[in-house]
Amino acid sequence: MNPELGFSKALEAIEPIADEAPIVLIDGRTGSGKTDFALNLQNELFRILDQAPRLISMDDLYPGWGGLNEGALYLLRHILIPLSKNQTAYWNRYDWHAKSREGKLTSFSGGTPLIVEGCGSLSMASRELSDYAIWISAPEQIRRERFSERDGGIFDEFYEKWSSQEDEFYSTHRSAELSNLRIENP
């Protein structure tokens, strides 16, 4: 499904449950367009609901370039599991420059929709704790180009390392198959 139709389908599914503060997961390989899709969804839901959905980026949860699995577990332990128990979620953003989680504690108690975007957000465990899941894909060459363009090529050396973690994670969790909606973003 193309991005425009996918966006409409996502809104059709999420809008009726928006008052129930749904948890929406947006996953896909690096460079597939998850962040732009999530920001557009957040803005459109804000326009419709007159309340801003919370947006969490997995980039704030990974403990560095080797941390895709750890970031996925951090999402579960510190955000999704507490919210599933009607508790406040507390977490520290990972500081990629300081290479630590020390810093300001962030919290979220629910009450508005939550959108989590990023590689590893959609696992077997996280799917059980969410209300709607979206998988976004794009051809590998396009994803690689987007990855390089996003930060001016300064992180190109990490592409293969990250991609191999994605291979392992997605073959284990079969994230695309867990989604309610699959979008091809060429």
Positions of PLM-derived features:
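Conserved lysine of the Walker
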Residues: 34
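Extreme N-terminal, non-catalytic leader segments
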Residues: 1-25
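Post-Walker A helix-loop "phosphate-sensing" segment adjacent to the P-loop in P-loop NTPases
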Residues: 43-54
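P-loop (Walker A) phosphate-binding loop of NTP-binding proteins
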Residues: 29
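Hydrophobic positions on the alpha1 helix immediately C-terminal to the Walker A/P-loop
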Residues: 37
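ATP-dependent NMP and nucleoside kinases share a basic, alpha-helical "lid"
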Residues: 100-149
